[in-house]
Amino acid sequence: MTSPDPAPPRPRVHVLTLRPDGAREDTARRVGAVLAEAFATDPYTLGLVPEDRRGPRLERKFTAAVRQGLRAGADGAPLGAVDVAVDAADGTLLGAAVWTSPAAPRGVDVPGLLAGLPTAVAVHGRHTLALKRIQAACERARPAGRHWYLEEVGTVPSARGRGAASALVRHGQRRASGLPVHLEASVPATVPFYERLGFRATGHVPVPGGEPLTCLRWEA
């Protein structure tokens, strides 16, 4: 009696943090493209990005998010972080996470808003105003105290089931060093995933014409 050979173990996932002073523009674009692929079927994202040239729009959107995560303050302190999950065997990018650090300014950043407006309009078109309203509501839902904010986390479809997303979130939890972590889940089905990582739901942000965002918080 014979049995089929067991499937070979899948290569491990490593998580790396990009250095703001060492991340080149092509790196930002590569990571942005990975996130664009990860969110290519996300209902919330697609509801705010016109169908025309949607692929390039998504890549521009997430490349801008990566650049934002790599920025530093006037004193050189990082205002965010960008982590990437890679296949330990061949270095293939599997996913990424973009974070805002406790050092980032809160409230309305008028210069930043104006600087980012051309990209927002190019990506979101007629949905730009709706997006800004949702973002303002998300800002109001964030904790008042110091915390890390998980802006984006996603993995490419071929990497799902390998633990890359969990590894990315856990990496950020360790970096938080006892501070809370806050995020919004755009799809209700992903809430249990975050709950398994220790998050708890704290409220919702309404999305006109779509599912509300679920606010979640993790505390050490």
Enumerate the predicted regions with their spans:
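Conserved N-terminal entry element of GNAT/NAT acetyltransferase domains
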Residues: M1-R29, A33, E37
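Conserved GNAT acetyl-CoA-binding A-motif
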Residues: R146-W148, R175-S186
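Conserved acetyl-CoA-binding loop-helix of GNAT-fold acetyltransferases
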Residues: E152-P157, G161-R174, R196
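Conserved beta-strand-loop-alpha-helix junction that forms the acyl-donor binding cleft
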Residues: E151-R160, H182-P192, P208-G209, E219
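Conserved active-site alpha-helix within GNAT-family acetyltransferase domains
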Residues: S166, G178, V187-H204, P208-E211
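A short helix-loop-beta-strand connector motif used in the catalytic cores of GNAT acetyltransferases and
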Residues: R60-V84, P143-R146
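Conserved beta-hairpin
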Residues: G76-A97, G154
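Conserved acyl-donor/pantetheine-binding loop and adjacent beta-alpha core of acyl/acetyltransferases
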Residues: A96-G154, R160, P208, P212
